[in-house]
Amino acid sequence: MYSLMGVFTALITPFKDDFSIDENAFCHLIEEQISNNIHGLVPCGTTAECPTLSFEEYCKVIELCVKITNKRVPIIAGSSSNSTQEAIKRTLYVQSLNVDAALVVVPYYNRPSDEGIYQHFKAVHDATNLPIIAYNIPNRSAIDASDALLARILSLPRIIGLKDSTGDVSRPLNLKLLLNKEVVLFSGDDSTCLGFYAQSGSGGRTGCISVVSNVIPKIHADMHNAFLANNMKEAMNANLSVFKLAKALFCQSSPAPTKYAMSLIKNISPAVRLPLVELTQENKLKVEKTLKELKLI
């Protein structure tokens, strides 16, 4: 298995104007990511608009990613659901495709208790044989799992890491105080990921599952590489670009701003599926302004 660390792009799912999946654009996006030295890929996460994909479409996206990637970089496949049985079904499916790990979110909408959240992860863990990255994203799930709960979840043998999207850079240190094993800690917040790396330590078991790297994969990957090489000046220069773009790409519900940016620089349709909608004119101008400042258009 690959070492799971570094910048993993939370891939968008490109759509055609009729809202069907644009398979050619998706395959081209993967090639472009790999050619820009991205460390890994995450299909069917939040940025993929996964809740709007049918199960058949979900399977197709994962299959395409596995086929085109062809083991050149590791894949962490999203297999989340607020239904435990559906999460098990999806995790078993991605396991059958020999991906490197599954990304499983804290269950959304149901608002389970801490015990219910733990039992959800334990059930997925016990029903499968794949390494699992737990995913905490309170803006989407309405629950911010506590450090104690996350440490309990991470104590399960094959739950090997965490993606935390809170932007709380104290979380890596808090978890280190509670855990008796080494885990990989991914930031899910582009704006604070460099600080998250620093708090995770210099050993390299850290990274970012990124929205921004859809647009600037090389800059984002170079930032992580510079951090590991202890080149803080280079890392901080790259971080400024990541931070500026992150602010623009979250001006409206994600991934609509990212898709609009990619329509300007990568010839990918800005189409998103309802209930998401394309950017307002005001927000289009915000994205365009940032892309111009970064000399991307």
UniProtKB/Swiss-Prot annotation:
Reactions catalysed: L-aspartate 4-semialdehyde + pyruvate = (2S,4S)-4-hydroxy-2,3,4,5-tetrahydrodipicolinate + H2O + H(+)
Keywords: Amino-acid biosynthesis, Cytoplasm, Diaminopimelate biosynthesis, Lyase, Lysine biosynthesis, Schiff base
Residues annotated as the enzyme's active site: Y135 (proton donor/acceptor), K163 (schiff-base intermediate with substrate)
Record localization: Cytoplasm
UniProt xrefs under Gene3D superfamilies: Aldolase class I (3.20.20.70)
Superkingdom in the source lineage: Bacteria
Residues where pyruvate binds: T47, I209
Part of a proton relay during catalysis, annotated site positions: T46, Y109
GO cellular component, one term: cytoplasm
Listed GO biological process terms: diaminopimelate biosynthetic process; lysine biosynthetic process via diaminopimelate
EC number: 4.3.3.7
Pathway where this protein functions: Amino-acid biosynthesis; L-lysine biosynthesis via DAP pathway; (S)-tetrahydrodipicolinate from L-aspartate: step 3/4
Pfam family, one: DHDPS
GO molecular function terms listed in the Swiss-Prot or TrEMBL record: 4-hydroxy-tetrahydrodipicolinate synthase activity
SMART domains registered for this protein in UniProt: DHDPS
Coarse class of the protein's main subcellular location: cytoplasm
Enzyme class: lyase
NCBIfam families reported for this sequence: dapA (TIGR00674)
The family this protein is said to belong to: Belongs to the DapA family.
Complex formation: Homotetramer; dimer of dimers.
Function in brief: Catalyzes the condensation of (S)-aspartate-beta-semialdehyde [(S)-ASA] and pyruvate to 4-hydroxy-tetrahydrodipicolinate (HTPA).
PANTHER family: 4-HYDROXY-2-OXOGLUTARATE ALDOLASE, MITOCHONDRIAL, DIHYDRODIPICOLINATE SYNTHASE
Name of this chain's protein: 4-hydroxy-tetrahydrodipicolinate synthase
Organism: Ehrlichia chaffeensis (strain ATCC CRL-10679 / Arkansas)
